[in-house]
């Protein structure tokens, strides 16, 4: 395999490519179709899915859309819950001061693999750097501890006005590691995207770089070998390529790359070169920063290989580029000219590629990581990982791989595989329940239920939500997942006071009962009364009953002994978003999508119209209702009832934690009355859908919907 010139024309414009005959694998086409397609967003007032443009310039309200009838001034005028707000007989003295507590981000469970690539690397110390949500993560895989770029205490503001001068405030979408493994670069989405360069060992910020308005997101980013420049590609209509001086923070060059999306980019490793290559949809090109004009030079295929899309690219020390083709082949380039191709993957597409120690290491749709010698195009080592490979890196005989299923895998020189990170990986993740002081359970739209060990910071069990494909009886949860509604779960509950069962609410309306956290894979009962998907569930304090809140507007009550249905609570005019049991198990209060706060007597399953007054002396086993006298001050100024997604009280009753649409976890004094100030914590990039104190309030747990990330906040 030589590196001679292409037999194609020397002028790129003279090569006419018929893209209808290009060799692009069908599954790669499907991925790109999904990336550009309209997505479903959840209207939190109607509870229905609505279509939105997936590449909206600003995603402030992307996945939770407020309906006109229930938001803004109309909401403020109507407030249907207001008549149910009564001051409780016993409460703490109100204070507007922020609570005198500090919660630090200790650990996050997440890795963005759904739509990103080449985003997981070794740093100089051998630790693994990657990203999830709005965080850059440095994982010490031996100690299982993490450091972060971003995250921590922040102002209680919308993302539209949140400060983005110090860290990311929205989804990180692209990453690179410098060739010397000391710097990381990350870029985020938003109407005016920003990117950062930060220390790969400590997470300390080194520089910030702002793109033009309308950039939508950073799709690719790369640090040059000398650590002088960072190249950044936007997802605007022209897919502009920017070059910034890392130390000065100034823009050096900018040019339009064309109409097609750029997936990845890399700088030449050859001494003296200042050349960057871009790989994308129907696109391979090089850009020479040292040339008289900074202009794109399209790849020339000639007769050396079939045109295709390219998902990733790397360079060797001699100045040859290697791109991962959408047809399973690796393309070898000298400058803009294709010199040869070789195929070691055989099928699918090449999803990741890296030049390490004189070899090409690549990963593909075929679920294989392959070390190959580009000189002869032969595979020297093949490792089967059984999943689409999104990212590969190699250092000191070890390989780290990011997989599409949300797993980060480390492989030693003997081929031994170790999962160093597991995460939810498709659609959204909503389900979160605390089982005991060290154990919690999560579920998502990826057909996964996880049991987690908080103290040891790892997953202890994983089970499928369902093994059959079933659609919803009516309606349906909004999601980008490719899994059937039966395989998606938005709600989990643990019977802490009783038999230890775990209930999982599916998006097709069914509820499955699992034996417990140690037998999460064993379904002992299936409940099918609900007509739509399940958003909330709770066991009674003594564990004798299970309440299931459905999007068919009803609450179903079951005996936890045999899960026979005891009754149905019917009074709400919209889907159920939260429910709480009284400590004695005699009352249930619930909130729905129409902002109603209602009370029911469990004995006769009837609504108590005077429930607010009749329960002023009542203590509540849980406090998830976002409307009430004790939580009247939790809504940010100018927002409506849809902006708070979950509420929990600490076991001592002194603190309140809320999850909001701005990606914030907020800690308040109890009560949180008008004018109260929270301690606000940022780390999530999208709407936080659930948050809980652990027993003794030593930790706060939170889960982000679209970012699919679980965060563990430790009290200092």
From Swiss-Prot:
Short name of any one Pfam family annotated for the protein: Beta-prop_EML_2
Keywords for this protein: Repeat, WD repeat
Domain of life: Eukaryota
PROSITE patterns referenced in this protein's UniProt entry, alphabetically: WD_REPEATS_2 (PS50082), WD_REPEATS_REGION (PS50294)
Gene3D superfamilies named among the record's database cross-references: YVTN repeat-like/Quinoprotein amine dehydrogenase
Annotated WD repeat ranges: 167-208, 213-254, 257-297, 305-343, 345-382, 424-462, 529-568, 571-610, 639-678, 683-715
Keyword Nucleotide-binding among UniProt keywords: no
An annotated Gene Ontology molecular function: microtubule binding
SUPFAM superfamilies assigned: Quinoprotein alcohol dehydrogenase-like, WD40 repeat-like
InterPro entries tied to this protein: Beta-prop_EML-like_2nd, Beta-prop_EML_1st, HELP, Quinoprotein_ADH-like_sf, WD40/YVTN_repeat-like_dom_sf, WD40_repeat_dom_sf, WD40_rpt, WD_repeat_EMAP
Biased amino acid composition, Polar residues: 8-21
Chain spans, region Disordered: 1-53
Compositional bias segments (type: Basic and acidic residues): 23-53
Similarity comment: family membership: Belongs to the WD repeat EMAP family.
Listed name of the protein: Ciliary WD repeat-containing protein ctxp80
Protein's organism: Euplotoides octocarinatus (Freshwater ciliate)
